[in-house]
């Protein structure tokens, strides 16, 4: 709701980043557009903030693409509306590189972008507070993870361990589901269970 969006944007506004900060707040055409109105009213005169209202629901990915298309900085940080950041996150992310991250980071580097990992940069997020919200989140994440697996051909030329990690991360749950279905089928057909 509005309180989450306000907390997120306020945490970005308070960043101690010394460089030029541009913030694109994108409403992806959600059904709850009223949540962004108080945030817009509060930051409309702040030159660091731009508000983009998508005419129809396009989803997070396309909303992110719109914001990234408007960006011209060296550092692009994508934040969900339910995330709040500590004051030094942007400055720590903009500091000297210390370590390489995982597959999406390698793909970005391969495309010519510079990426940074700073272990001291901590963000907090709101966790689902109901089983339905949790299941929706997990379904969303599973779709995203499966889409990453479909991009495995992009990983093949980069790092075999990352490729195996990506495949294994999606193969495990599929094998678990197959195991449960097989067990239930055995129970239904033979009145025995394979794990006794």
Curated annotation (Swiss-Prot):
UniProt EC number: 2.4.1.-
Catalytic class of the enzyme: transferase
Gene name for this UniProt entry: nodC
Record's protein name: N-acetylglucosaminyltransferase
Major site of localization recorded for this protein: membrane
Similarity comment text for this entry: Belongs to the NodC/HAS family.
Membrane topology: Peripheral membrane protein
Origin species: Rhizobium sp. (strain MPIK3030)
Record's keyword terms, sorted: Cell membrane, Glycosyltransferase, Membrane, Nodulation, Plasmid, Transferase
